């Protein structure tokens, strides 16, 4: 039955790649930058704000892109120099099709990016997968980071049953499902996934869904996305997190079904001195659901530091 359903989905929904040139023509703007890193990586990032301002680097989550932070950039652009980048397999970043999404590799990717740009010490915020990469980078290269903001960050494994997850997550748990997802125009699955991610469904607009779907159809992206190893993202442990030196703010929504609020509380409890904010009636993406409030809390935290 599963095989028949997946075969039908592939036949009905398969969609071709969208060339990078077309995506860049549509989405690039005055803030668009690119830098090349070893391993065939052509990294897209956006840089906004005056160079004299404190530096804030933003990391998106799995399947997302730099655009997830649009609301924060609007709110914080006059207070911070902001750099937001696309991970391999995401957004406008080009990567070899055999790139494997692992937490440790992504942390080293961000470190290499920071070294290439010769960035000074910076504050780092990460959403979901990007949150896991953020705390892993802070452990591996503590001298780079002066503050951490973990937004519904992966860290400790959930205890929830897979049945509670949206269909896209359930399909991706099976090898055959991942093969199907590599080849389809997954717009309807993305709509399902994003609406499950948030409490306020109205924030998931057709334009947002279209953007996710178009970026994921960049050459090689769907293959890279299906390579993700969640065990390298949900691998936090209290003894290891004790070594985190950076002041840390943990943000979560009480209606998050992707990273359970209990996991966020556990993460905050394990990090020395971490502050925790739990938003009522908010899901997995507070930077999209409540951009003004979450950005204000982020700014207050960063500005409270000496």
Feature locations, PLM:
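Alpha/beta-hydrolase fold catalytic core
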Residues: 1-54, 79-80, 120, 303-306
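Conserved alpha/beta-hydrolase catalytic His-Asp/Glu region
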Residues: 15-16, 22-23, 161-165, 181-242
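Active-site loop/oxyanion-hole signature of alpha/beta-hydrolase fold enzymes
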Residues: 38-39, 46-48, 87-125
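Conserved HGGG/HGGXW glycine-rich cap/lid loop of the alpha/beta-hydrolase fold
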Residues: 48-92
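Flexible "cap/lid" loop of the alpha/beta hydrolase fold
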Residues: 139, 148-178
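Short beta-strand/loop motif that positions the catalytic acidic residue
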Residues: 244, 250-252
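Acidic catalytic loop of the alpha/beta-hydrolase fold
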Residues: 255-259
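Catalytic active-site module of serine/aspartate enzymes centered on a nucleophile-bearing elbow/loop
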Residues: 274-306
């Amino acid at each position: 039955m599963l095989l028949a359903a997946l075969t039908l989905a592939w036949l009905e929904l398969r969609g071709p790649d969208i060339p990078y040139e077309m995506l860049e023509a549509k989405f690039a703007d005055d803030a668009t930058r690119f830098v090349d890193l070893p391993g065939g990586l052509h990294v897209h990032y956006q840089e906004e704000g005056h160079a004299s301002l404190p530096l804030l680097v933003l990391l998106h989550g799995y399947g997302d892109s730099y655009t997830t932070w649009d609301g924060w950039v609007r709110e914080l652009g006059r207070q911070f120099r902001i750099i937001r980048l696309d991970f391999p397999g995401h957004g406008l970043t080009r990567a070899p099709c055999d790139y494997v999404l692992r937490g440790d590799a992504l942390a080293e990717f961000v470190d290499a990016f920071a070294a290439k740009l010769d960035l000074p010490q910076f504050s780092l915020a990460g959403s979901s997968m990007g949150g896991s990469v953020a705390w892993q980078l802070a452990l591996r290269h503590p001298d780079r980071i002066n503050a951490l903001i973990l937004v519904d960050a992966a860290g400790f494994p959930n205890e929830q049953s897979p049945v509670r997850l949206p269909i896209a997550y359930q399909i991706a748990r099976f090898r055959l499902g991942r093969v199907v997802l590599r080849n389809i125009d997954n717009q309807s699955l993305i709509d399902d996934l994003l609406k499950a991610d948030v409490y306020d469904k109205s924030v998931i607009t057709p334009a947002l869904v279209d953007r996710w779907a178009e970026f994921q159809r960049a050459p090689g992206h769907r293959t890279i996305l299906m390579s993700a190893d969640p065990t390298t993202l949900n691998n936090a442990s209290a003894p290891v997190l004790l070594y985190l030196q950076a002041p840390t703010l943990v943000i979560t929504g009480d209606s998050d079904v992707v990273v359970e609020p209990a996991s966020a509380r556990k993460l905050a409890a394990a990090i020395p001195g971490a502050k925790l904010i739990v938003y009522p009636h908010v899901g997995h993406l507070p930077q999209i659901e409540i951009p003004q409030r979450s950005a204000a809390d982020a700014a207050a935290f960063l500005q409270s530091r000496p």
